[in-house]
């Protein structure tokens, strides 16, 4: 049995608050058309590339035409990354999944 210390709970809460602060900052940046410079400031080129790859993974998983192995070859992503994307998509709220289908697959 694993016990969670108050210290680890406090750290988790602090990290969650920092994440929510970033999300709010990004929302404000979009409202003021500063989102691209903000994201370029906050993310390295590798992180931006990884996010683009993750969008492609979700898109292809939603499309359902390729196996995870085919996605690995097509995108050059690790099988673990694709599996995490698949697991995250399975646990995503239905509303989010429908929204993603509408946005990512509308031109398919």
From Swiss-Prot:
CC terms in the record's Gene Ontology section: cytoplasm
NCBIfam families recorded: TrpR
Name of the encoding gene: trpR
Cell compartment(s), UniProt: Cytoplasm
Record's keyword annotation contains Transit peptide: no
Subunit structure: Homodimer.
Predominant place of localization: cytoplasm
Organism: Salmonella typhimurium (strain LT2 / SGSC1412 / ATCC 700720)
GO MF term set: DNA-binding transcription factor activity; sequence-specific DNA binding
UniProt-listed InterPro entries: Trp_repress, Trp_repress_bac, Trp_repressor/repl_initiator, TrpR-like_sf
Gene Ontology process terms (BP): negative regulation of DNA-templated transcription; regulation of DNA-templated transcription
DNA-binding region in chain numbering: 68-91
Name this polypeptide is given: Trp operon repressor
Cross-referenced PANTHER family: TRP OPERON REPRESSOR (PTHR38025:SF1)
Keyword Repressor: yes
